Swiss-Prot record:
Gene of this entry: gatA
Keyword Ribosomal protein: no
SUPFAM superfamilies: Amidase signature (AS) enzymes
Sorted UniProt keywords: ATP-binding, Ligase, Nucleotide-binding, Protein biosynthesis
Record's keyword annotation contains ATP-binding: yes
InterPro entries, per the entry: Amidase, Amidase_CS, Amidase_dom, AS_sf, GatA
Record protein name field: Glutamyl-tRNA(Gln) amidotransferase subunit A
Function per UniProt: Allows the formation of correctly charged Gln-tRNA(Gln) through the transamidation of misacylated Glu-tRNA(Gln) in organisms which lack glutaminyl-tRNA synthetase. The reaction takes place in the presence of glutamine and ATP through an activated gamma-phospho-Glu-tRNA(Gln).
Active site: 75, 150, 174
Catalyzed chemical reaction(s): L-glutamyl-tRNA(Gln) + L-glutamine + ATP + H2O = L-glutaminyl-tRNA(Gln) + L-glutamate + ADP + phosphate + H(+)
GO CC annotations on file: glutamyl-tRNA(Gln) amidotransferase complex
One GO MF term attached to the UniProt entry: ATP binding
Length: 496
């Protein structure tokens, strides 16, 4: 039962093969047995079972919706009433929010049962989930490897079937890269599609929440509940609600032959995503996935995203600048860690922040403060914003000749734990294919498409699918067609 997808679990609940309480108990036992993975930072069985009992009551009345009674885990960047909300930081180690984030509230309103809070890189700053104040997360496929970051706890939980689904956030790739590393499906929606209210902020113009699950169809179900306008989020976009499952299982164009359901689909392949730096085993898996798409009727079209290489310096100017502002609120006065011993007020600020923040967070705050300082603002921050607009324009030019863009989610498979901690630049380079999508505000997702070679044979590879603004339903259709023809997303780590 634990290996079933959300769609399959929904059918099991409808057929009364299990109850919501039994499902919750099953996953709670699995979470407890897999503590070594360190995927969860906070679990409260009483709270979980209370929600499950309420869901069973709804189902018994013949009420409830598509998600009622189904379990989910939440990345610990979403504040939750009743559970601690830490953002992976000592600064918030004991913080309990008086309210739920909109994402959490909407999923609970849809009847989902919260299993707990998942581990993450501190304040979502990292690509390996080694920056958490609560310890590194291990990749269920190979426990010597990282699970990706910053949503590494969520990706590990879904991969190890400790939860059938989880929420994540993506600022520069933090849903797509860990989904790739852990062999699960994850989607970053268009910026503004999902409310950021109650999401502890890293970089406000980039942060976006999204679902992680076994399949594209599961992600579509979750996105139905998560998305929508929220007046409490000034960046939330007011659009008509839509059903993200509406194209699943349908041909790309009416009248397509059953054997070629994607005939007419044009897949753009950026030259810049297949150059130097792409590992051979990742390239082989991506090439095989693209051949599968051709077999389904799609056409491959070369495109260019010439500013791809600039996405890293642009991101690491803009994101730290916004982080330095957002994290200024954590001063030991209003909430968060406060130093036990200090002199005057200024000394209390300094010591509280020095003790509460980890090394990577401090590094990015310093970088952000520097690029915003007098004499450097124009040279760095404003220049980065100008290039950001050009990056978005490059995508729009590419979409004139294709419907979706594809390539690797990461240039390599997951690396060994501890292997890149001393070289942050190498860690930053791992996000080369995801950063530009975030800078442009476009939707993107990762779907499992293979494994690495030889020594990396247990480490998954993810195919990134990028859509135009608000084109998530079509993007999910394209991913779903691939998953109907392959079984990469159904494979599980040994022992699971």
């Amino acid at each position: 039962m634990h290996a079933k997808s959300l769609t399959e679990l929904r059918a099991a609940l409808a057929a009364k093969e299990c109850s919501a309480v039994e499902l919750a108990q099953l996953y709670l036992k699995r979470i407890d047995a897999a503590r070594d993975l360190n995927a969860f930072v906070h679990v409260d069985a009483d709270l979980t079972l209370a929600q499950a009992k309420a869901a069973d009551a709804e189902l018994a009345r013949g009420a409830g919706g598509a998600l009622t009674g189904l379990p989910i885990a939440h990345k610990d960047v979403f504040v939750t009433r009743g559970w601690r909300s830490t953002a992976g930081s000592k600064m918030l180690a004991n913080y309990e929010s008086p309210f739920d984030a909109t994402v959490v509230a909407r999923l609970q309103a849809a009847g989902m049962v919260t299993l707990g809070k998942t581990n993450m890189d501190e304040f979502a700053m990292g690509s390996s989930n080694e920056n958490s104040a609560f310890g590194a997360v291990k990749n269920p496929w190979d426990t010597n490897a990282v699970p990706g970051g910053s949503s590494g706890g969520s990706s590990a939980a879904v991969a190890a079937r400790l939860a059938p689904a989880a929420t994540g956030t993506d600022t520069g790739g933090s849903i797509r890269q860990p989904a790739s590393f852990a062999g699960v499906t994850g989607i970053k929606p268009t910026y503004g599609r999902v409310s950021r209210y109650g999401m502890i902020a890293f970089a406000s113009s980039l942060d976006q929440g999204g679902p992680m699950a076994q399949s594209a169809s599961d992600c579509a179900l979750l996105l139905n509940a998560m998305s929508g306008f929220d007046e409490r989020d000034s960046t939330s976009l007011e659009r008509e609600d839509e059903d993200f499952t509406r194209h699943l299982g349908q041909p790309w164009a009416a009248g397509n032959d059953a054997g070629k359901p994607l005939a007419g689909l044009r897949i753009g392949l950026p030259n810049e995503y297949f150059g130097d730096g792409l590992a051979d085993d990742v390239r082989a898996s991506i090439d095989a996935a693209l051949k599968q798409y051709e077999a389904l009727g799609a056409t491959l079209v070369p495109v260019s995203l010439p500013k791809t290489e600039l996405s890293i310096p642009v991101y690491y100017v803009i994101a730290p600048a916004e982080a330095s502002s957002n994290l200024s609120r954590f001063d030991g006065v209003r909430f968060g860690h406060r130093a036990a011993q200090y002199g005057d007020l200024l000394d209390m600020y300094k010591k509280s922040r020095a003790e509460g923040f980890g090394p990577e967070v401090k590094r990015r705050i310093l970088v952000g403060a520097y690029v915003l300082s007098h004499g450097y603002y124009d040279a760095y921050y404003l220049q980065a914003q100008k290039i950001r607009r050009i990056i978005a324009q490059d995508f729009q030019e590419a979409f004139k000749s294709c419907d979706v863009i594809m390539g690797p989610a990461s240039p390599t498979v997951a690396w060994d734990l501890g292997s890149k901690g001393d070289d942050p630049v190498q860690m930053y380079l791992a996000d080369i294919y995801t950063l530009s999508v975030s800078l442009a505000g476009l939707p993107g997702m990762s779907v499992p498409c293979g494994f690495g070679a030889s020594a990396n044979a247990k480490r998954p590879v993810g195919l990134q699918i990028i859509g135009n603004y608000f084109n998530e339903a079509r993007m999910l259709q394209v991913a779903d067609a691939f998953q109907r023809a392959t079984d990469w997303h159904k494979q599980v780590p040994a022992g699971v």
